[in-house]
Amino acid sequence: MKPFRSEFIQIRKLRYHVRHWGREDAPKIFMLHGWMDMSASFQFIVDCLRRDWHVIAPDWRGFGLSEWSGNDTYWFPDYLADLEAILKHYSPDSAVKLIGHSLGGNVASVYAGARPHRVEKLVSLEGGSLLESSPEQAPGRYAQWLDQDNDPPGLRTYATQAEVASRLQKNNPRLTDERAAFLAQHWSAQNEQGEWALMADPAHRKISPYLYRLDEVLSCWGAITAPVLMVVGEFPLLGLRMSDRKAGRAEIEFRTAAIPNSAIKTVAGAGHMLQHDQPEEVARLIEEFL
């Protein structure tokens, strides 16, 4: 595996962990992980990159080795502001190459619409996979949020790291033993009771009171000026959420069409965690596009 180095920087009053691969003077790529994930998730893609890159991958607030926010709810706009601060720190004067998976893809694509001059190229890995909400869902959503405020969610614990690895493979049967063991090592830590839990603030599991407004997202996407590559798995998350793979594919194509300069690539034999399932092909697509 390619070696990484850790750095801790101050981002909007929080201590952020940032993982680096490659020479500091090499061309930069920023990689943004998804929900209940962390920067180590990109190790397998980085191992498959053939060109010389300086890969910069933060742990989002409340994930991995980054500091927890201290609030009982995490808000999407904070990720945008955190990303802007990170880019100012590492690339204050130049537009950047962004790669985001899932939540990271959502953040990167909205940011690219809000700050089009700051993004040179964007690769979204299974981003934009949330189901559209309707206004009628608002009362129930607020009720759910209030209920969770009275009964905060927690994180499951495991007796050993091997159990963490087994759980990861249960969630994703395509994950190999070797990769599951690596992820368990970097995703989990022992608590005071000697049990293992994911390195994440349990508050991330609290439902957002805000609905997913697709029209607002597509408006942001329409403002993107950078070339965008949407990479989806053969078994995309949106298709699973819609209980229809063909309908999910059609929805992905509809949404991507909102981006002026965009293309879609599908990775065979991969699901939502395509960076774990087929990192060789994902790395090839990334470098071909960049």
Residue ranges and their predicted role:
Residues 17-68:
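Conserved HGGG/HGGXW glycine-rich cap/lid loop of the alpha/beta-hydrolase fold
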Residues 93-138:
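Conserved hydrolase catalytic core segment
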Residues 223-270:
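Conserved loop-alpha-helix segment in the C-terminal half of the alpha/beta-hydrolase fold
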Residues 154-214:
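Conserved alpha/beta-hydrolase catalytic His-Asp/Glu region
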Residues 125-158:
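A catalytic-pocket lid/entrance helix-loop region that shapes and gates access to the active site
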Residues 1-29, 50-53, 92-94, 129, ...:
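Alpha/beta-hydrolase fold catalytic core
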Residues 11-14, 57-99, 267, 284:
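Active-site loop/oxyanion-hole signature of alpha/beta-hydrolase fold enzymes
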Residues 258-290:
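Catalytic active-site module of serine/aspartate enzymes centered on a nucleophile-bearing elbow/loop
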